[in-house]
Amino acid sequence: MNMLALTIILPLIGFVLLAFSRGRWSENVSAIVGVGSVGLAALVTAFIGVDFFANGEQAYSQPLWTWMSVGDFNIGFNLVLDGLSLTMLSVVTGVGFLIHMYASWYMRGEEGYSRFFAYTNLFIASMVVLVLADNLLLMYLGWEGVGLCSYLLIGFYYTDPKNGAAAMKAFVVTRVGDVFLAFALFILYNELGTLNFREMVELAPAHFADGNNMLMWATLMLLGGAVGKSAQLPLQTWLADAMAGPTPVSALIHAATMVTAGVYLIPRTHGLFLMTPEVLHLVGIVGAVTLLLAGFAALVQTDIKRVLAYSTMSQIGYMFLALGVQAWDAAIFHLMTHAFFKALLFLASGSVILACHHEQNIFKMGGLRKSIPLVYLCFLVGGAALSALPLVTAGFFSKDEILAGAMANGHINLMVAGLVGAFMTSLYTFRMIFIVFHGKEQIHAHAVKGVTHSLPLIVLLILSTFVGALIVPPLQGVLPQTTELAHGSMLTLEITSGVVAVVGILLAAWLWLGKRTLVTSIANSAPGRLLGTWWYNAWGFDWLYDKVFVKPFLGIAWLLKRDPLNSMMNIPAVLSRFAGKGLLLSENGYLRWYVASMSIGAVVVLALLMVLR
């Protein structure tokens, strides 16, 4: 039990050593430190898991020190382990370790090799703090650490201005969500006097029994933080641009760390959301809308990583849908299985990119199944899991649990949205696979090999099959029991979702293996061009935000840069100067000018006196 802190300390040690090496170490030494620290953290997690199950899945807390103590405000740096945090910890360190191992191969020869692993080690440490925190403020520390590391890693190739812009965009958009989370923190402490998760859930029913609507505002702010970090509507615009970073970073962000943080936040504070059913229903609606919009956007992408990015957005949408219909176990189960097959797909896409000499446009590839058969197999299995192919994939079991939860709790509309999303998922996933690995070879791909390349792919491939679905998160007693669907209804739903997935795959095969001319004619038609452009640009959210927020902000910044307050303070001086110049012109030395001026002045004075009288 006392080993819990090591899951944070070990990656932190790796970060410190790599940071102070300042790139002087060889790639082998940097890889040993960077990969080894996360590997040791994963090993410690395994020991912790064995101990946890040996003690009857008894939750416990490990106080480390008092972080802050100001008057009645006391915040401890305390870690908590229960079934929920153990599941997340296993995903973060386990899948994170496999991604680090792959990255040691992928990043060979890249400038900043040790810097890369320094950032990823800090990323893992921050995520572990977020997962194990027993209070909202400590979670917020890890939350911000994850945001910082994502900025550093997305902009890893900082010499390219586009990468810097993508990193800044991710940083700014997620900061919007972080502000909402900070507001939630302030509201909850002001109302309950504590930020400890267990204490908040215990105190909330009595405190908010009189209909105080501050709890609704607090949960809305929590939802705002979650949608920012997990790239859900309306703060989803950063995720596709985050593909500017190295491919292992994409795998780390999408599978093991950042985007799962928002999903984790809601179950961790589930007691508060259960008291605000309207907000909880909104969580499900946000997820349903996001998964549909992301599915259509993925269908027209040409960049292999952007297809996977939108698929992540869609799958996180399924998790939000599950949370919204109170299918708590299903949401975490899908989070775990998604980590397996999404890490597999991203790492396999990295292999494709390197084999194709850093080409990412899927239409410039083709016929790669012969050149890189292992990667092709990984895409088939990972794509099948993403598409929830029946019985043989982990994704089928976890996604069906979500749809069953929606149906059992009476949210038929959300279940239908989930089925439509499942069809879209299988369609765009196998569109990508058929274009990249079948058809005419357009680029000479070289073979990719190496133990550190193949081993992580093989492990993730196995976990993406039904084997991964055998790992059941120990959530009993941590989250409320999910309403179960009757056996007959469950069987009908499984058959329906399976048929939907298979039909999507068959349609993709018909269109992109046999009828590409039909696809081209549809894409070149007027409606096709209109919808294609709209979906390709993610439904125009970037354009809208640019017009509504970015341009006005830049205009205000341009104005403030010129110090308008100081300019206003100069107005009296400018007026006095002009008045002085005018009076100076009247001093011309001509007597007739002075007589005329006096006469005019006298007439004006007399006129004023008469008017005023």
Predicted regions and their residues:
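Hard-cation-handling environments
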Residues: 443-506
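Hydrophobic core of alpha-helical transmembrane segments in multi-pass integral membrane proteins
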Residues: 38-47, 185, 292, 498-510
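Membrane-entry segments of alpha-helical transmembrane domains in multi-pass membrane proteins
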Residues: 1-9, 25-32, 73-91, 129-142, ...
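Hydrophobic alpha-helical membrane-insertion segments
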Residues: 36-53, 177-187, 380-387, 456-471, ...
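Transmembrane helix-loop-helix hairpins at membrane boundaries of multipass inner-membrane proteins
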Residues: 2-3, 21-118, 191-212, 237, ...
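Hydrophobic transmembrane alpha-helices and their helix-loop junctions in integral membrane proteins
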Residues: 90, 94, 98-139, 148-452, ...
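Aromatic-capped, Gly/Pro-kinked transmembrane alpha-helices
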Residues: 72, 477-492, 517-613
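N-terminal signal-anchor/start-transfer transmembrane helix
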Residues: 7-23, 97-98, 227, 291
